[in-house]
């Protein structure tokens, strides 16, 4: 899995799991709003009054309505170990 994907998945999954409303801005300037129903490597399914399949390559920015905690234990920086001199 690429590093970019390992950042996207926990973030999008937290938004989906907690049903956090989002604003998604497309590269052409259009703003979409709703909740993330599901996603995969290429698309996000956005739910509002209708379901919309949005291709990730068309997305500029995803803005949650509130702060999101999407960090996992594996995301924490490693601590430096003391070396004996």
Swiss-Prot record:
Signal peptide: none annotated. Residues 9-68 form the Sm domain. Residues 66-85 are annotated as: Disordered. Gene3D superfamilies: 2.30.30.100. Pfam families: Hfq. GO terms for biological process: regulation of DNA-templated transcription; regulation of RNA stability; regulation of translation, ncRNA-mediated. One of its GO terms (cellular component) is cytosol. The keyword RNA-binding applies. PROSITE patterns: SM. GO terms for molecular function: RNA binding. Residues 72-85 have a biased composition (Basic and acidic residues). CDD domains: Hfq. RNA chaperone that binds small regulatory RNA (sRNAs) and mRNAs to facilitate mRNA translational regulation in response to envelope stress, environmental stress and changes in metabolite concentrations. Also binds with high specificity to tRNAs. Belongs to the Hfq family. NCBIfam families: Hfq (TIGR02383), PRK00395.1 (NF001602). This is RNA-binding protein Hfq. It comes from Photobacterium profundum (strain SS9). The lineage of its organism: Bacteria, Pseudomonadati, Pseudomonadota, Gammaproteobacteria, Vibrionales.
